């Protein structure tokens, strides 16, 4: 490929619009929106992530530094970065087929076992490279696996990635997406690259079933349930429908003790991977996705355009509202199906918690050690709403309302609504859920800090 015409310096102050023309919005990542763009002088297509400087600039610099150091065909390539007014533009390789998550969402399909094996071979190659240079991705999921039109996969979105230095053999901060997080990450007992292996095991289930295990469980309960040693490791909902090789591969990825969990290099030798077929197996899925995108446009196919309009309406409404959710970033909810997740929720010491939006309707959670940040929790995710006074039924149940409507069978209650009305009601329900999450987290953080203060005081006596 030709060389891009871009400044060599990091965080260049030159105007990026003199180098690139934005074509369309591709999606929304954990740290900002991503756009397809063309390098004006060469015609090369790239992806540009625009990140508001309201976010932590230090984190962005870490991400850029991380990407610049990575040189692998299985890792998205970094090209340049710009600082423009209140935004940072990160220019990177464009993977035309988008993420695995987007492909599933747009086509409303899951991946076959053979397709999962092909993706897994590429992902494990990428992880093997990262781990060999002492780096941890820390946010492996289908939304962070990008594909090109050949069906080749690459790891992306290093917003929460970390590097293992010689003086810090194991990370002590907890950063990742709760449904995909390894037990040792949540327990804050220190972790290494094996955490990525667990996350990829969860990602394989996500690719097979469209959602990760426990997706229907409250996020706060999830972080209590995953580390519970009495809970069996996650597995496919119907393992008998999948090959013994795939089930065994998952079991190895999802080994609870990290010291017994195989490395990426070891997993590349597993029969499930060694028997993986050609990248061309992914092409039919990509072609089907492209047909839908050509008919509707990518933003409509992903629901981005509708969400942006709803956000504008919400912003207008919020000007006159006392309920200031200025720190929250709205995301479109995905439809939820009950998978019968267990309800055991023993509590664990989870530290101070930060939830940031990853735009896949699943929150990215950051726990900090007490010595790093004992401040209040931040919640940067909620859903769009057009009805401020809407109260979902589960809230009425909490209030023990005597309203007869709570006794109406749910299927009868909602059957008369149109599809669009049901979608809006689901979005509003998600808003109430996020409000309850925030209240719970605030209470949890306050109580924990109070307990720690008393413990420290007693220790000093």
Swiss-Prot record:
Residues 411-458 form the SARAH domain. PROSITE patterns: PROTEIN_KINASE_ATP (PS00107), PROTEIN_KINASE_DOM (PS50011), SARAH (PS50951). It is an enzyme of class 2 (transferase). Its EC number is 2.7.11.1. The active site is at residue 139. Its cofactor is Mn(2+). Disruption phenotype: Cells exhibit reduced viability under hyperosmotic conditions. They produce smaller aggregates on membrane filters and do not form aggregation streams on a plastic surface under submerged starvation conditions, but are normal in sexual development. During early asexual development, the expression of cAMP related genes peaks earlier in the knockout mutants. Neither cAMP oscillation in starved cells nor an increase in the cAMP level following osmotic stress was observed in mutants lacking krsA. It catalyses: L-seryl-[protein] + ATP = O-phospho-L-seryl-[protein] + ADP + H(+); L-threonyl-[protein] + ATP = O-phospho-L-threonyl-[protein] + ADP + H(+). Residues 307-322 have a biased composition (Acidic residues). One of its GO terms (biological process) is protein tetramerization. The keyword Acetylation does not apply. It holds the Pfam family Pkinase. Regulates both cAMP signaling during early development and the stress response. Functions as an activator of adenylylcyclase. Belongs to the protein kinase superfamily. STE Ser/Thr protein kinase family. STE20 subfamily. This is Serine/threonine-protein kinase 4 homolog A. It comes from Dictyostelium discoideum (Social amoeba). The gene is krsA.
